[in-house]
Amino acid sequence: MEIDLNADLGEGCGSDEALLDLVTSANIACGWHAGGANAMRDCVRWAVQKGVSIGAHPSFHDPENFGRKEMQLPPGDIYAGVLYQLGALSAIAQAEGGRIAHVKPHGALYNQAARDPTIADAVVSAIHDFDPSLSVFGLANSVFVAAARHAGLVAIEEVFADRGYRADGTLVPRSQPGALIDDEDAVLARTLDMVRERQVRAVTGEWVPLNAQTVCLHGDGPHALAFAKRIRAALETAGIDVIAPGALQAGEDA
């Protein structure tokens, strides 16, 4: 059994280089919700050095709200914004001897694309037109995953170890009770359930089936690094290989 571990990096949380020793895929902020050119370059360089798969983490242009405020934009604006961010990170990756392998939207863009076909299609179209060999990371069982596959892209279904799920497979909004799970032992157990049993218990008690192909490790908490080490160790102890999806790795030629 195999699983990918990914983390959102370049967002000013301070533990990026160390997290890259634990994850197999890095989603690098492209400057619109956090980070900037220097942070992007640092993360790409470290990813190339450590053999971690490089991904773009585009968002709405909303640094004031860390990209977590939902926006209603024309599809053309979303398309252009995603293209813009992919171009920026791709240029830096090329200069550092790597290349982008995947794309994972951030925050509100991620959540809206997961349920809104119009937004999903705009994001997918931008990725496809930029480079149809790129894979996408999206919420397991979501509209976004379906849209990507319909467009011929490889879609990697993502699960969240420390987030609450609703019975329909969507994430509990951060503003609601049960959105974030702080108990580390509970998160470890949930991670193994999602990876081995292909299911997660919703906040209302139901078991929700899902196809876990990559697990997101959040890197923005005070204990994020230590906890990431526990999750990776638990997976390896359970005999699960931690490996990036696909053959395209940072620093390799396609």
UniProtKB/Swiss-Prot annotation:
The reaction(s) this protein catalyses: 5-oxo-L-proline + ATP + 2 H2O = L-glutamate + ADP + phosphate + H(+)
SUPFAM superfamilies, A to Z: Glycoside hydrolase/deacetylase
Any one biological process term the GO annotation gives: carbohydrate metabolic process
UniProtKB keywords: ATP-binding, Hydrolase, Nucleotide-binding
Molecular function GO labels: 5-oxoprolinase (ATP-hydrolyzing) activity; ATP binding
Enzyme class: hydrolase
Disulphide bridges: none
Signal peptide: none
Entry EC number(s): 3.5.2.9
InterPro entries on file: Glyco_hydro/deAcase_b/a-brl (IPR011330), LamB/YcsF/PxpA-like (IPR005501)
Gene3D superfamilies listed in its UniProt record: Glycoside hydrolase/deacetylase (3.20.20.370)
Job description of the protein: Catalyzes the cleavage of 5-oxoproline to form L-glutamate coupled to the hydrolysis of ATP to ADP and inorganic phosphate.
PANTHER family: 5-OXOPROLINASE SUBUNIT A, UNCHARACTERIZED PROTEIN YBGL-RELATED
Subunit structure: Forms a complex composed of PxpA, PxpB and PxpC.
Annotated family: Belongs to the LamB/PxpA family.
HAMAP family: PxpA
Protein name: 5-oxoprolinase subunit A
Organism the protein comes from: Burkholderia vietnamiensis (strain G4 / LMG 22486) (Burkholderia cepacia (strain R1808))
Gene name of the record: pxpA
